[in-house]
Design a protein with these regions (language model features):
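His/Cys-centered metal/cofactor-coordination and adjacent catalytic loops
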Residues: 112
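Non-catalytic substrate-recognition and accessory regions of acyl/acetyltransferase enzymes
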Residues: 1-81, 86-109, 119, 123-170
């Protein structure tokens, strides 16, 4: 059963938090937050801008495309190892292509924790890195993409995206 939780952020209209609970025990199985966001293609380096725009018909191209940010996602330790996280991402993706969805949304984006297991999880679920390397992402975020620089510290997260149009064409 899906329930809304975390009312403080919801009251301020900043994000919505949801959790799935077992109806018989009220145990939280998993939880996630979503917020409106966008992929601002016009501010990206030309190779990335072209990569994303190439999938959009010319007449529909815009400086940015609507996205939903999955801000937090967690599975209870009691249910880990049962692919609940995979099912949760499938649920979120299907939610935003449902005809009854109240908003247009082209992408699901995440700031994945910079750890190989997290990258493998999101890649297994169809997510791709927006930037091809830590260095490229770090340079863009810290230097506005002007000149290549060497990262001072490792990235804590990496931006990944899933193009929802893929589910429409399956």
């Amino acid at each position: 059963m899906l329930e809304q939780c975390d009312f403080m952020y919801a009251y301020q209209l900043l994000r919505k938090s949801y959790c799935f609970v077992k109806p018989d025990t009220s145990e939280i199985v998993c939880a996630f937050t979503v917020a409106n966001s966008s992929v601002k293609v016009d501010s990206l380096p030309s190779n990335l801008r072209n990569k994303l725009n190439r999938k959009i018909p010319n007449a529909k191209r815009r400086p940015q495309y609507p996205a939903v940010l999955v801000g937090q996602l967690a599975v209870s330790d009691l249910f880990s190892g049962h692919h609940v996280g995979d099912e949760l991402l499938d649920f979120i993706k299907s939610w935003f292509i449902d005809p009854l969805n109240k908003t247009g949304c082209r992408y699901v984006i995440v700031d994945a924790v910079n750890h190989p297991k997290m990258f493998e999880y999101y890649q297994r679920n169809g997510f791709k890195f927006l930037f091809s390397s830590d260095k490229e992402e770090w340079t863009f975020l810290h230097n506005k993409g002007l000149e290549p620089t060497t990262p001072v510290e490792p990235m804590k997260t990496r931006l990944m995206y899933f193009d929802l149009i893929y589910l429409r064409t399956k």
